[in-house]
Regions:
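Intrinsic-disorder/low-complexity accessory segments
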Residues: 1-403
Length: 403
């Protein structure tokens, strides 16, 4: 249906079919391949988390018992397969398919985010050829439910390649990699960040120290000779100030403002905890600041005096001009969100790992952007104007919006 509930309208937008050579001609593919090996999977943690998410929602998954080849790539035994031949295929497909880009509607109640592989950062391949699926399904084990998957993911370990008993480069690709580094730093271990070369933006530590975290986290790592790697020592695990800490309630349950009225603060707190950072509501005790809420006066002063700061969301971005002269922030009228291809104009330690992993898709919620920045600013990421977003709600139904 379209915005006016006309049955069958815009079917090509909302239910496109796989009509390529040898493909099934359906909206649903045959299956999805989600690698669980370090050679074919950039983010092992996110892939394992997705396996648990799917089965927690009653989707059945399979794991291959032998290697197989699809589209010229060989996948080992232990690769996850999400079949579309099951009762809950719409649950799985709704999370994994590449989404719908809506331009012609005037308004949308809420974002319709899909493409979990892009938003969560794991590698995935869509299979739409029945012949290929027949070969893949032939090497699959029995369907797994949530209990089966929990046992399976608990048995997964970090991926290591290269020389043992030297130094180890840990790929900076997930919450787990950051949490592992924070654990090492808090234990007084030496960890560096690689400053140049193929591993720029990744972490480096000793093999012995790597082994203390490799069993706890799902990491991708490579043994290297440290003389071939340039790195800067990370002096400590930073304490992070989270903006927008809500005051306690004077009546009733004191934490009501934190639990039910402060979504941004809650998300930021959860994210920092997942990555192993110590957090504080006192900016004078912080080594860095981050958050989705506009900075208060004390935090703003600290940032102006040099405190590193990561701000996102409308609240933070629209107030950037309070911190940096010459910044202008613009929002697209009526737009909701999109998954958009991006480019990286400048390679720095902030974005080097994204560049190395070929991660050129960014999820933008609210569709605000910096329409003007100072000439001296280093731009880390920009939307790629030569490509079309794959998913989202960007209305172009009026001349003003289309412009």
């Amino acid at each position: 249906c379209d915005q006016n509930d006309v049955e069958g309208a815009e079917m090509d937008v909302f239910r496109p079919e796989y009509n390529g050579t040898g493909q099934n001609g359906n909206f649903y593919p045959e299956c999805y391949i989600i690698p669980l090996d370090g050679k074919n999977q950039t983010n092992l943690q996110a892939a394992a988390d997705m396996m648990e998410w799917l089965t927690r929602n009653d989707v059945k998954v399979n794991v291959t018992e032998k290697e197989f080849t699809y589209d010229g790539v060989t996948y080992p035994a232990g690769t996850m397969i999400v079949s579309m031949y099951q009762a809950k295929r719409s649950v799985a497909n709704g999370a994994l398919y590449d989404g719908t880009l809506i331009n012609g509607w005037t308004i949308l109640y809420s974002e319709g985010i899909t493409s979990f592989n892009e938003t969560r950062g794991f590698d995935m391949v869509t299979v739409a050829e029945p012949a290929a699926y027949k070969s893949i399904s032939a090497v699959c084990g029995d369907a797994m439910d949530h209990d089966d998957v929990l046992a399976y993911t608990n048995s997964l370990g970090s991926y290591f390649t290269g020389e043992k008993n030297k130094d180890v480069v840990i790929s900076n690709a997930s919450e787990d990699s950051t949490a592992a580094v924070n654990e090492l730093l808090k234990a007084g271990k030496t960890v560096g960040m690689v400053t140049s070369g193929d591993h720029m933006g990744d972490f480096i530590c000793s093999y012995a120290d790597y082994q203390t975290v490799a069993g706890k986290y799902l990491l991708s790592a490579a043994g290297v000779d440290k003389t071939s790697v340039k790195a800067k020592i990370i002096t400590k695990s930073p304490t992070v100030y989270i903006s927008g800490t809500p005051a306690e309630s004077e009546k009733g349950f004191v934490y009501t403002p934190q639990i039910s009225q402060s979504a941004g603060w809650n998300y930021d707190t959860a994210a920092m905890n997942l990555m192993g950072f110590t957090t504080t509501s006192d900016v004078t005790k912080a080594d860095a600041a981050a958050g989705a809420t506009k900075l208060d006066a004390a935090a703003k002063t600290a940032v102006k005096n040099g405190l590193p700061y990561i701000g996102y969301s409308y609240s933070a971005a629209s107030s950037a001009s309070d911190l940096i002269a010459g910044v202008e922030y613009t929002e697209l009228d009526g737009a909701m969100d999109c998954l958009t291809p991006v480019v990286y104009p400048n390679k720095t330690l902030v974005n080097a790992s994204y560049i190395a992993d070929g991660d050129d898709i960014l999820y933008a919620y609210g569709l605000g952007y910096f329409s003007k920045v100072p000439a001296s600013a280093t731009v880390l990421v920009k939307s790629d104007k030569t490509k079309t977003p794959t998913e989202g709600f960007i209305p172009t139904n009026t001349a003003e919006r289309a412009a």
